[in-house]
């Protein structure tokens, strides 16, 4: 930043380590849209003098009107007042009053977060910072990561206190589009079968009103309620960030900022940094932030809070990269959602019924063995006995293999998100075609069984009309007949459920 004496009083700009740090705990009670209350813990850090025992006097620094302030907005999942400690200490040591708070979650989970109330909660934190006598109300900023960037859009629109913002790996597009992008891209990175990516698109086409996921189509962009990205903005991405659409995200931020008359947008890319700019696997303790990031973000915050003119390039650092486009074509389909849920519900009920019948047959068989009786349990005809058993086992293995492939994809993606190196598992690729082959074998086999049953039934009808003795078509025991039709129906609905997920389309 250019040194401007009229704004700095001829004093040198503070940097990381210019001040020692004092901290204290504060509590704020926030309320959700449903009226649920949560007591947030907050760590407030303030610049201290050289002794480290008393707060520094802003009048003796470039911050003659009061220290600038910063609060932090959490990303997805849970968050605590102990988070962001390293960045908060960096900023405080450069003269900022910082507040790190518990994430406002109330009684919600990731899929039903109360975004409007979360924004109000963070606004309440901003108001608290503004109420401090040693804080300059015109120099308060926000630091948002990942999901927090969605909430920051609401905060920026509704709060008059925010004068600049730092967005770390920001989510820009709607949750449906963001999920579609990062899951599809990550499946490609872990070399999963492309069929799983096509399945993701079908799952994300579920109607949110039916599955009670209102946030998936939450419209964070709402110019009718106020402009967005109208304040100085610092955007940072890591080259190993596998969750955000970096090129599309930056383009959208620039588009909205320029539309609202803001040309003060700085973009930085950092090599090796993951989704939250940590180095390595963030699941491990004490992972560091990307090289130079802490200096860059601190220097930018100091210069911007003082209103200085930036002399470095607006866009710099590692090249930002994006392998696929944003899936803006994905939207909710009510009919498909209802059909899939109905089929899934019936399939689960049939699986439970089939399991009960299998357990019952085992108990009956054990009873026969104890009593020395050799009579059959099901009484199925010889033709059906082997086929129904083989197809039942094949159907269950097909479903289990399919679900195992999905589970392995999820595990690999989670590790990738945390910053670990990609894990290539053969299961994520061959489970898809093998499931297809097994499913087709079941369909062909059962088709031959039912065609044979139709022939037999037709022949038996003729025998009945001639009043000739009639042999059993399916089984000579009611338990066997029930078992056959429940097993057949279970296999049918398993295949139908897999078909609705797109198993036979790719």
Locate predicted features:
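Soluble extramembrane regions of membrane proteins in the secretory/endomembrane system
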Residues: 2-311
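Juxtamembrane amphipathic/hinge helix adjacent to a transmembrane helix
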Residues: 294-334
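Extended non-globular C-terminal regions
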Residues: 321-506
């Amino acid at each position: 930043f250019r040194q401007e004496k009229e704004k700095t009083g001829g004093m040198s700009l503070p940097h990381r380590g210019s001040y020692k740090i004092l901290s204290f705990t504060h509590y704020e009670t926030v309320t959700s849209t449903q009226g649920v209350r949560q007591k947030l813990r907050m760590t407030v850090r303030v610049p201290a003098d050289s002794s480290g025992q008393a707060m520094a006097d802003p009048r003796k620094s470039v911050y003659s009107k009061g220290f600038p302030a910063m609060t932090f907005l959490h990303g997805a999942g849970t968050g605590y007042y102990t988070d962001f400690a390293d960045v908060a200490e960096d900023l405080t040591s450069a003269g900022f009053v910082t507040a790190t708070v518990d994430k406002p979650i109330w009684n919600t989970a990731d899929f039903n977060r109360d975004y409007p109330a979360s924004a109000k909660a963070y606004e309440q934190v901003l108001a608290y910072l503004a109420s401090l006598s040693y804080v300059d109300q015109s120099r308060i900023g926000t630091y948002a990561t990942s999901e927090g960037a969605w909430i920051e859009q609401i905060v920026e629109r509704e709060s008059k206190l925010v004068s600049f913002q730092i967005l770390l790996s920001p989510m820009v597009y709607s949750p449906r589009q963001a999920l579609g992008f990062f899951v599809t891209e990550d499946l490609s990175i872990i070399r999963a079968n492309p069929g799983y990516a096509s399945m993701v698109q079908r799952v994300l086409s579920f109607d949110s009103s039916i599955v009670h996921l209102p946030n998936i189509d939450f419209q964070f962009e709402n110019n009718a309620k106020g402009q967005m990205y109208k304040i100085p903005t610092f955007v940072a991405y890591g080259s190993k960030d596998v969750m955000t659409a970096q090129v599309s995200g930056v383009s959208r931020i620039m588009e909205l900022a320029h539309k609202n008359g803001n040309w003060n947008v700085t973009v930085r890319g950092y090599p090796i940094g993951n989704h939250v700019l940590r180095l390595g696997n963030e699941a491990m303790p004490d992972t560091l932030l990307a090289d130079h990031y802490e200096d860059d973000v601190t220097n930018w915050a100091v210069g911007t809070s003082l209103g200085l003119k930036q002399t470095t390039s607006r866009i710099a650092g590692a090249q930002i990269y994006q392998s696929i486009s944003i899936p803006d074509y994905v939207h909710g389909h009510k009919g498909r959602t209802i059909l899939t849920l109905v089929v899934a519900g019936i399939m689960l009920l049939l699986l439970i019924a089939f399991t009960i019948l299998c357990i019952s047959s085992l108990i009956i068989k054990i009873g026969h063995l104890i009593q020395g009786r050799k009579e059959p349990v099901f009484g199925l005809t010889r033709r059906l006995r082997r086929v129904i058993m083989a197809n039942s086992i094949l159907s269950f293995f097909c479903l289990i293999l399919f679900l195992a492939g999905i589970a392995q994809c999820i595990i690999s993606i989670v590790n990738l998100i945390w910053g670990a190196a990609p894990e290539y598992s053969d299961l994520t690729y061959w489970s898809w075609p093998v499931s297809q082959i097994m499913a087709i074998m079941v369909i062909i086999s059962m088709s031959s069984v039912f065609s044979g049953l139709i022939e037999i039934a037709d022949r038996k009808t003729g025998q009945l009309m001639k009043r000739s003795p009639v042999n059993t078509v399916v089984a000579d025991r009611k338990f066997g007949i029930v078992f056959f039709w429940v097993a057949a129906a279970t296999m049918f609905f398993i295949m139908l459920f897999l078909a609705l997920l797109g198993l036979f389309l790719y």
